[in-house]
């Protein structure tokens, strides 16, 4: 019998097993990292062969279930990341997943339906292969020994890697060992969750660090500073910036009181990195979470301000996340469950507190976070139909604008100022099931271009700068901007708003979801353009 005939007979008898191997291999090569592909494929095949030779069906299913579910979940995550963002899954995405609260996950389930279906299909496919006891396959002894050799070799390589890392960093990390070992298994993406867990532990270790600053405190004539951080806001959908629908009438009515930034850009296309970049001394080029304690809250506290953090982004996992490591330093923190307007009573209470101290009040909004149709009460919808994604997104912008109008009303008779900016923008592709989505690898300018302005109460008169800024200004330098706005600076920093803007304007470096640094100016303007700025066939029409 020829080799071909033997293979043909084997394929006919075990075609489902061959199909599993092909699906696993192609999915991992296309949508995941190709690193250690041979070991991962051997691990996958040998595990299936070992399990198929377990004679007891209950025991076979008991052993198979965790392997099947983890492998299917890993592949589904890879497919989601690749199809949605055009990049492989990474530790940045893993951090975002771990920081998502249950309410947010439930709201976004509709966006994940195709990948939940993929998970179900892959799970059933792998179970269909494993469920049948097959004596024609190599014995458990042979496949078991081979599997142990693969596992032992992988563990040895992982230990070598962890040892070198410990030698360089003078400290051993079990997360590095677990992360490296995962890269040799079918559960490759566990590697990124291990790295995310390591980041979580590092954040816990530094969250209570309060540095001492040499500060220069200058009287700006302002007593109350309200900093509003929006979520997932696109400049292209704001009439303040020329959009055809009237989505920002309240802000536009205050145009004479506003210093507008026409070319503000976020340092990163996702919240877990963009907000710390904006509120701490961290930077695009030298990202290090040890910079996080050097933040606007700690500086305001040391300068004698009364500080508040009011958030409609869930308090789930309050400890050990990048944003909450900053928020927890505020003297008073409030988290609400529901729409952004629920923050207004807490803002009123903060304003009414009698004190001789200046106040810094941070409002962290849910804004236009996906799915936008759930970001506002249906009674607040002004654009129809309400199940249209563009109408939903525009309604979310209008809802935020209404909230801003109410904030202005609360502050108009006070010596107060409001700074508003969004953490990042969003991509838009009308051909996709989910039209609006976060930027991924080499994101377009739309994922970074954000609204930003400073509003000054009429009580402050004409002695403040309300001119429009047309140069690029990255929110990665907003910690310096906010410090100067409050009149609380370090000697080495620019001291005034004008000095900060003059010093940092034009720096257009951004980081994408793959942690690669790009020049914003060189990115394509829209997601539906190719890298040279030409409309793609999918984006035409």
What is the predicted role of each segment?
Residues 1-179:
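Transmembrane and membrane-interface helices of multi-pass
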Residues 8-18, 54-56, 127, 131-134, ...:
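Membrane-interface soluble catalytic domains
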Residues 30-34, 284-286, 388-397, 405-408, ...:
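Active-site rim elements
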Residues 159-381, 449, 475, 479-508, ...:
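Active-site-proximal alpha/beta segments of enzymes that process anionic O-linked groups
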Residues 226, 399-437, 479-483:
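Metal-dependent active-site segment of extracytoplasmic phospho-/sulfohydrolases and closely related
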Residues 242-246, 421-458:
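Histidine-centered active-site microenvironments of extracellular/periplasmic hydrolases
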Residues 309-311, 360-367, 394, 417-422, ...:
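Short beta-strand segments
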Residues 315-319, 366-415, 432, 440-449:
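Active-site-proximal cap/lid insertion segments
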